[in-house]
């Protein structure tokens, strides 16, 4: 009888341990591909010029949407206040594709691409993109080579930004027409407008 009790006790101790909980992702790399037409940021004589682009990581884009160009250009930290998480600035040139990769801050819910044009018009000088859930909100799982998984969240999001004249737009439709390191060719008809 004691032998049976010992056998039961050993069987209970040797049961399969519970599965390990996957570790949370602690890093998300965001890629922004800025694609420019040959006609960006025209000078007074109509010649294309390079333009500075700022990529903002924001908690909310409402303050940005309610701001004007001069406010953001001259005093972005003051205007955006606590919504501003991080900002990065770099030049882009006519008829090019520039890829910028950065680590997403967990507090950021939006990225905004803003071009500091010579003569901006209306609200066309920026484009806001909502970020997928923060990596801290989900499980890591397997990294996906193309940035998207068949099931589950986008682990490393990619955004395409199109700049033409003095406009910043969602550039996904131009991604295939301007390969990385290439020049603009056979763009959709909207590119010529």
What residue ranges belong to the model's regions?
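Envelope-exposed proteins and targeting segments
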Residues: 28-30, 49-51, 96-98, 109, ...
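Bacterial signal peptide processing site
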Residues: 14-17
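Non-catalytic, glycine-rich low-complexity segments
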Residues: 19-32
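C-terminal motif of bacterial Sec signal peptides marking the signal peptidase cleavage site
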Residues: 9-12
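Structured domain cores in non-transmembrane regions
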Residues: 52, 57-123
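Short amphipathic, basic-aromatic surface patches that mediate peripheral association
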Residues: 32-44
């Amino acid at each position: 009888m004691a032998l049976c009790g010992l056998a039961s006790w050993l069987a209970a101790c040797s049961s399969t341990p519970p599965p390990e909980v996957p570790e949370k992702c602690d890093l998300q790399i965001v890629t922004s591909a800025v694609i420019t037409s040959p006609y960006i940021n025209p000078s007074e004589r109509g010649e294309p010029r390079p333009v500075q682009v700022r990529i903002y990581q924001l908690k909310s884009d409402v303050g940005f949407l309610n701001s004007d160009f001069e406010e953001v250009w001259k005093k972005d930290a003051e205007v955006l206040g606590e919504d501003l998480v991080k900002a990065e600035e770099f030049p882009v040139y006519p008829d090019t594709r520039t890829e910028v990769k950065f680590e997403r801050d967990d507090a950021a819910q939006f990225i905004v691409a803003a071009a500091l044009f010579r003569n901006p018009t209306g609200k066309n000088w920026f484009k806001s993109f909502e970020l997928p859930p923060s990596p801290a909100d989900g499980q890591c799982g397997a990294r996906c080579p193309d940035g998207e998984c068949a099931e589950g969240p986008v682990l490393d999001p990619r955004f395409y930004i199109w700049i033409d004249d003095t406009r910043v737009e969602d550039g996904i439709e131009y991604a295939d027409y301007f390969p990385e390191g290439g020049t603009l060719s056979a763009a959709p008809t909207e590119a010529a407008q």
